[in-house]
Amino acid sequence: YRKFIGKYFKGNRVNEINRNVTPAKYRELFGQLSARQKEIIEDRESRCIVVAAGPGSGKTRVLVHKLASLLLLEDVKHEQLLMLTFSRAAATEFKQRLMQLIGNAAHFVEIKTFHSYCFDLLGRIGNLDDVSGVVAKAAEMINNGEVEQNHIGKTVLVIDEAQDMGSDDYALVSALMAVNEDMRVIAVGDDDQNIYEFRGSDSKYMYQLSK
C-alpha cells in the first residue's frame, strides 16, 4: 500500500492520504500552527522529542495539538497515551483545551500529575503526609516487575514542564521507557524556568531523555 501511494502520489498529497481526517478538518485543527510547530505535530518517527522554549512561545498549544494529532492522525488509542504534569491545574487545563479540539474523546485520555499517577499505580489514595517518596517507590516497583504490564503499557508518554523533573521523576520516566521499548516520549519545557529547583528539579533531566 505504501509503495503504491508513494509511486502514484507525491509530496503533500501523500501526507493527506495518510491522515485519518479530511484536508478541511486538518486545516481547521492545525492550519494556524507555525512551520516548526507543524514539524513537531507531524513527526511520527522520533522516539524522543524534546521541545525547549520560553514563555509565550506556544508550548502549551503545541502540546495540546500534538495530543490531538496522536489521536486523530496516527493510530494511537487513548488508552495507549499518558500525559504527566506537575500540577492538577495544568492537568485540568490540558484536558479542557483538548476537549475544545477533539470533543468528549478527551475524557478518555490519561492526563495526571506525576504523584497522582504513581498513587494510582500503587493502589493508594494520595495524602499530603505520604507524598514525598511515592514517585521513587513507583519507579522501583516498575523496575522490579511488581506492576502489571496492563497498568503501565503505553506507546506514547507526554511530559509537560519537563524542566521541573527531579531525579525521582526521571527515574519513573526511565522505568516506563525500559518496560515499553517502543514507547515515544514527547517532553516540553523551558530550561530558564524551574520553579521546583528547591526540591532537586533540574532541566538536565529533560535533555537526558533524548540521549
Each language-model region and where it sits:
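P-loop NTPase Walker
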Residues: 1-127
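Conserved two-lobed SF2 helicase motor
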Residues: 110-116, 130-142
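Structural preference for long, well-ordered alpha-helical segments in enzyme cores
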Residues: 63-67, 90, 94-98, 138-145, ...
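Catalytic P-loop NTPase motifs of RecA-like helicase/translocase cores
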Residues: 40, 58, 70, 118, ...
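Conserved RecA-like helicase ATPase core segment
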Residues: 171-211
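SF2 helicase catalytic motif II
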Residues: 152-169, 186-187, 192-193
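Short basic/glycine-enriched coil/helix segment immediately N-terminal to the Walker B
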Residues: 43, 133, 140-157, 178-181
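Basic/charged alpha-beta structural segments of nucleotide/phosphate-handling enzymes
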Residues: 1-13, 146-152, 157-158, 189
